[in-house]
From Swiss-Prot:
Type II interferon produced by immune cells such as T-cells and NK cells that plays crucial roles in antimicrobial, antiviral, and antitumor responses by activating effector immune cells and enhancing antigen presentation. Primarily signals through the JAK-STAT pathway after interaction with its receptor IFNGR1 to affect gene regulation. Upon IFNG binding, IFNGR1 intracellular domain opens out to allow association of downstream signaling components JAK2, JAK1 and STAT1, leading to STAT1 activation, nuclear translocation and transcription of IFNG-regulated genes. GO terms for molecular function: cytokine activity; type II interferon receptor binding. GO terms for biological process: adaptive immune response; defense response to virus; humoral immune response. This is Interferon gamma. GO terms for cellular component: extracellular space. Released primarily from activated T lymphocytes. It comes from the Eukaryota. Homodimer. Interacts with IFNGR1 (via extracellular domain); this interaction promotes IFNGR1 dimerization. Residues 1-23 form the signal peptide. Belongs to the type II (or gamma) interferon family.
Length: 166
């Protein structure tokens, strides 16, 4: 009898430990509140296919997936910003935004502020467009993988060193 109790307790721990739903119940409740408010469980929502899920499936590498996720999170932050005056769903949006903030930006308020600044940059403003084009070379250089540059410099130095010793 005692042995059976230990096995059942162990199985319960494994099930609860592997289930993310157990510790995230309030988060899911808030999503359910938003689904009810927007009538998002209605079958017509599926018309035209999913908005983000198919795109997420296409990206397997973690670094690539982060790029897509940043665009999706940006969309949700814009959506919540547009609905900020709606008191009926404000609490739900705040809880979900906080959870996104923790998961995507690792709780860094500096990252959140920078992320919000980027979201709010108007692309139809001529001055903004001119600044963006002016900064494009530096942005492109920043996008280049730095590890390859280091490897290239290292191999060039090794090659030069061999040539100099002959």
């Amino acid at each position: 009898m005692n042995y059976t109790s230990y096995i059942l307790a162990f199985q319960l721990c494994v099930i609860l430990g592997s289930s993310g739903c157990y510790c995230q119940a309030p988060f899911f409740d808030e999503i359910e509140n938003l689904k009810k408010y927007f009538n998002a469980s209605n079958p017509d929502v599926a018309d035209g296919g999913p908005l983000f899920l198919e795109i997420l499936k296409n990206w397997k590498e973690e670094s690539d997936k982060k790029i897509i996720q940043s665009q999706i999170v940006s969309f949700y932050f814009k959506l919540f910003e547009n609905l900020k005056d709606n008191q009926i769903i404000q609490r739900s949006m705040d809880i979900i935004k906080q959870d996104m903030f923790q998961k995507f930006l690792n709780g860094s308020s500096e990252k959140l502020e920078d992320f919000k600044k980027l979201i709010q940059i108007p692309v139809d403003n001529l001055k903004v467009q001119r600044k963006a084009i002016s900064e494009l070379i530096k942005v492109m250089n920043d996008l280049s993988p730095k590890s390859n540059l280091r490897k290239r410099k290292r191999s060039q130095n090794l090659f030069r060193g061999r040539r100099a010793s002959k």
